[in-house]
Amino acid sequence: MGLVGVGSFARISVIDDDHAVREATKDLLRSLGYEAVTFESAEAFLNSGAFAETACILTDVQMPGMDGVALQTFLLSHGHSLPMIFITAFPDDDVKRKVLDAGAYGYLVKPFDESRLLHCIETAMAH
């Protein structure tokens, strides 16, 4: 469990404006056997071209500039249906329903439980 994708394509892009959250999440994902790359904003992710090498996106909901919901909308409108998992410190039932209805594999409230994140990732990677 947790090593799904080890030895295969398992790059997760972590997008969060909080440096500490990005680094802690990256370290956690790497300890679980995933390759993780981080971005401080949705714009930085899009400008990097990393979506072509990303198996799953783990993104904050609320960020300056383009937020996680807008990123999901942008990617879907441009034909990129990458698996996405949302994390937030400010839960909102309307936002949760919107992102899940649009295909997100999870909506986790910070601080989130490692096992819940792992379940979301494994579900996303299986599709």
Question: What residue spans do the PLM features occupy?
Answer:
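Two-component/phosphorelay signaling modules centered on CheY-like receiver
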Residues: H19-V37, A124
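Conserved phosphotransfer cores of two-component systems
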Residues: S48-A52, F74-S81, A102
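Active-site beta3 strand of CheY-like receiver
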Residues: A52-L58
